[in-house]
Design a protein with these regions (language model features):
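Gly/Ser/Thr-rich active-site cleft segment
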Residues: 17-19, 141-143, 153-282, 378
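A short, N-terminal amphipathic alpha-helix
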Residues: 77-86
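Conserved phosphate-binding catalytic cores of ATP/NTP-utilizing and phosphoryl-transfer enzymes
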Residues: 2-7, 260-271, 281-298
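Glycine/Thr-rich phosphate-binding loops that ligate phosphate moieties of nucleotide
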Residues: 1-51, 57, 61-62, 69-76, ...
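Alpha-helical transmembrane segments that form the membrane-embedded catalytic/substrate-binding core
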Residues: 277-287, 307, 482-487
Length: 557
């Protein structure tokens, strides 16, 4: 294993530039965390007057942006914090990072000269104040581009055709529709822009003192890249804006080297001049690295404000639901992502109505009810749902004659369940939906393993339900900040690939010592009884039938 070892006494620095904060994580050569810091935008940079890191435009429904310079100043502040922690920057062999997906930055004509001649005696903020043609960056929360989405889909032959090429149908938050909106409505700004970066490639650009390429994984979140060819799609570019490819620059693999660290950081913070900057990527791809998802059959379920399912596959089949990105840690693999808007807030709503606003009572009710919930199926949409595309509403059904087989199953709609059934209904309903949609994307049944993360992954009752429904072991991780941890891991991986002169599987770095690293995870729930798993499969099929009917009757585009 020596040939895959990292240099002793070296560090690897990972960042996560997210919606609400900038995080930094430092790993040593054994992949153990030695330092971490956090800048919270609202509280640490209050003069920007953001709320949750963003501006919501009251005059333009759905327009949500963040001040670009806030991200720059956050980096200045982060380095002040890291310096005070006595981190020896000269030991850092590589830097990489994570950026909130889909967000975009617009560099004004002439800004490349500013980037390449940064004065180490001045903070970045002071030097980049006039570098951007748009001061406020559109971000993933923005939903003001519905017209642009439909126009792009129509131009390429429909939503399914766009999904087959780019990995996703057009979504309002994706970068392509956001660029089209600027091109159509603010042509003078578009024409005064020499480079369009994602948040990830924008931050990487600061570190190399030049425009960094967009990586394949994050580039797939734009509705602009051909995911099979890993190149810009001509038809998608033409459907979006004129002269777009020249403004986007090149694409690069996530494990590639963006460049050596800029002299600014060498002179100001005493980085080694040979420190590598590995391509930055999106937050979700970095989480895949931080959760050690790297082989087909691996699945992660993130249970947070929104719920997300990640899976690894070699043979993706993009459709009208979900997203497909090239894997950031596997040269031939892909990651599939399924997003649910109704996550912890919807579970909390059921808790508040049925469990005395107490998670202890909620868990007690969940444990008191039998698996399969006596054939009761619930659909809980406190918010407009993405997957499936359904409006706000709760729908409840009781399956009659349920014996564990699909034959003879008939459902009856009811107005309400008793509190214990409602509690189990909201948990099982979401997990059955996840299993059904993941299997459509080619997830093996059962998966090899599931890694659960997010706030609700601390709930053992929910973990047991995951194991029972999916039929595999469920693991949990030491730390919840998987994006910044994943970025530091990717920094080490990129350094190793560069040393070897080409791609190496990321697992080579930790396969014999994973349990001794900050990446280790623990078994939290064992695979469910296979007879029960089969019964869940049957009721899942019935649930899918009902879901399809609801979409036909109530579904949104």
């Amino acid at each position: 294993m020596a040939e895959f070892s990292l240099p002793n006494d070296s560090y690897f620095l990972g960042f996560d530039s997210s919606t609400q904060s900038l995080k930094a994580t430092v790993l040593d050569s054994n992949l153990n965390i030695i330092a971490s810091e956090l800048i919270h935008f609202d509280s640490d940079l209050p003069h920007y007057k953001t709320q949750d890191g963003v501006y919501r435009d009251p005059s333009n429904n759905g327009r949500i942006v963040s001040p670009t310079l806030m991200w720059v100043e956050a980096l200045d502040l982060m380095f002040q914090k890291l310096s005070k922690s006595n981190l020896d920057f000269s030991k850092i062999s590589a830097v990489s990072g994570s950026g909130q997906q889909h967000g975009s930055v617009y560099w004004k004509i002439g800004s490349s000269k500013i980037l390449s001649s940064l004065d180490h005696k001045k903070p970045l903020l002071e030097q980049l104040e006039n570098a951007f043609s748009i001061k406020e960056s559109p971000i993933w929360m923005d939903c003001s581009t519905t017209a642009e989405c439909r126009a792009i889909e129509n131009a390429v032959g429909g939503a399914l055709e766009l999904a087959k090429v780019t990995g996703s149908r057009a979504y309002e938050r994706f970068t392509g529709p956001q660029i089209k909106k600027i091109f159509d409505h603010q042509p003078e700004i578009y024409n005064n822009t020499e480079r369009i970066s994602l948040v990830s490639s924008f931050m990487a650009s600061l570190f190399i003192g030049a425009y960094a390429a967009i990586d394949h994984s994050d580039g797939a979140g734009m509705n602009l890249m051909d995911i099979k060819e890993k190149a810009w799609s001509k038809v998608a570019l033409e459907a979006t804006a004129n002269d777009l490819e020249s403004k986007l620059g090149n694409l690069a693999p996530a494990y590639g080297v963006a460049g050596k660290i800029a002299s600014y950081f060498v002179e100001r913070y005493h980085f080694n001049k040979d420190c590598l900057v590995i391509q930055w990527s999106g937050d979700n791809p970095n989480s895949v690295a931080g959760l050690t998802l790297n082989i087909p059959g691996d699945l992660a379920i993130s249970l947070g404000t929104s719920d997300t399912v990640f899976m690894i596959t070699k043979d993706p089949n993009p459709g009208l639901e979900g997203h497909v990105f090239p894997s950031p840690v596997d040269a031939e693999g892909y990651m599939v992502m399924l997003c649910y808007k109704n996550g912890s807030l919807t579970r909390e709503d059921v808790r508040n109505r049925c469990a005395e606003k107490s998670w202890d009572v909620f868990n007690k009710l969940l444990q008191e009810t039998q698996p399969l919930n006596g054939g009761k199926l619930g659909f809980y949409y406190k918010e407009h749902e993405i997957l499936p595309p359904l409006p706000v509403g709760y729908h409840r059904y009781i399956i009659e004659n349920f014996s564990g087989a699909l034959d003879g199953m008939k459902e009856q709609e009811v107005k309400e369940f008793d509190p214990p059934s409602e509690v189990r209904g909201v948990i099982e309903g979401q997990l059955l939906s996840m299993r059904a949609h993941a299997e459509r994307f080619g997830m093996p049944s059962p998966p090899k393993r599931i890694i659960a993360t997010g706030g609700a992954s601390a709930n053992n009752s929910i973990l047991s339900s995951i194991a029972s429904i999916f039929g595999c072991d469920v693991y949990t991780v030491q730390r919840q900040d998987s994006a910044s941890l994943g970025a530091a891991v990717r920094a080490a991986h990129g350094w190793l690939c560069n040393k070897k002169g080409g791609y190496l599987p990321i697992s080579n770095m930790y396969m014999d010592k994973l349990e001794k690293t900050s990446l280790s995870c623990k078994l939290s729930a064992s695979a469910g009884d296979q007879e029960l798993v089969s019964k869940y499969a049957a009721i899942m099929k019935k649930r899918t039938e009902i879901e399809n009917r609801l979409v036909q009757k109530l579904g949104r585009c």
